[in-house]
Amino acid sequence: MRRQRSAVPILALLALLALLALIVGLGASGCAWKPPTTRPSPPNTCKDSDGPTADTVRQAIAAVPIVVPGSKWVEITRGHTRNCRLHWVQIIPTIASQSTPQQLLFFDRNIPLGSPTRNPKPYITVLPAGDDTVTVQYQWQIGSDQECCPTGIGTVRFHIGSDGKLEALGSIPHQ
């Protein structure tokens, strides 16, 4: 005669697995720590007509002295503040490496404001803009830093001053 197996151990195992899944599910869904969420950026309401024209940008770029012989400046990116007034264009030489100096050009809508630094700087990053400020991160090599990995870092915010000129809100790092 063949013995029948009891369903009790199988049911107990299934109940244990269900309980474990419930515990893990609660931990993953709301009882465990979650990293803080960032507020989404407001939608971009600026129009092309709020910024510099192509001709204004072309003239501003042409006025920047060439730093790499045999190359010319080209635009690599641009942006603006959320109030659509302060615009920036980042330029780099056509012959460049990771550490080739770059330049930022600022505009009050279609009026050129120039660059915040007299000389181009390598490793420039423009961070997400504020309502009326642009934050620029400058990096530089220190000691035996490799070209890929500068360890010097600092930021400064820029806005249009009451006189209509570009104004740094703090000192520009590594001048």
Swiss-Prot record:
Keyword Transmembrane: no
Chain coiled-coil ranges: none
Main location: membrane
Membrane topology qualifier: Lipid-anchor
Lipid-modified sites (S-diacylglycerol cysteine): 31
One Pfam family recorded for the sequence: Lipoprotein_21
Lipid-modified residues, N-palmitoyl cysteine kind: 31
Signal peptide span: 1-30
Name this protein carries in UniProt: Putative lipoprotein LppP
